[in-house]
Amino acid sequence: RRVFTLTFLFLAAEAFHLSDRIETRESETGKGLATCKKDSICAYLQQNARGVTPAHMCECPGEQTCPLSWDPDDGKTLTRGDEQYKFCSSPPQALHECKEKELVFTSKFEYEANSNPRKFLSYAGYIHCACPIGFSYHLTRRTNSTTEGQDLETVYFSCEEYKTCGTNDTCHIISESSEAFMIYKMCNCDEDLKCPTDPEAAFRTDHIEQVLDYNLYNMQCQ
């Protein structure tokens, strides 16, 4: 399952593949989304050439709801270019601008301890600072621990400036399923080139068969 080498490189990729874990959890346990942790994002939205793709991460507690439509003025949203991060109540206030390579985002995945294959239980994601446009959420490290009968995987993202693509570099990776279409930007094309968003222009396509079947399209600057 080579696809999981990509899972945590970018937040959009994480949101897409989290849907597969949630579907697996529902099919195995009959349970829906886990309840959101305090201050965690409840959804991630990406606006791209196909419209808006939402990724619902967790259910808000009590009578609170998680907005899944593109709206910068709903009082529960942080907007960053073509991305929105949704919260059960208000988003973090007065976030400072991230410094280069500063910790910007932490993801926490809970699994049932000693399960094989691992049984996914819940997700939480926390924003620590405002990463400027032109910078990416980039994987820096991940840790694993066990506590109270649960395995916890924590993934750390830093705010890093996009590099310029080389001649043979992948500029975008596109994930497409029957329910979602997301683009993961890898680098910036030179000024006279563009990174295509049409899957038919891909130089390599991988078909992944899991609970959710989807294609991965690798794009190069043209």
UniProtKB/Swiss-Prot annotation:
A molecular function GO annotation: toxin activity
Tissue localization of expression: Expressed by the venom gland.
An example Gene Ontology CC term for this record: extracellular region
Keyword annotations of the record: Disulfide bond, Secreted, Signal, Toxin
Location of the protein in the cell: Secreted
Post-translational modification: Contains 8 disulfide bonds.
Chief location: secreted
Gene3D superfamilies per the UniProt record, alphabetical: 2.20.20.160
Protein family per UniProt: Belongs to the scoloptoxin-11 family.
Name this protein carries in UniProt: U-scoloptoxin(11)-Sm5a
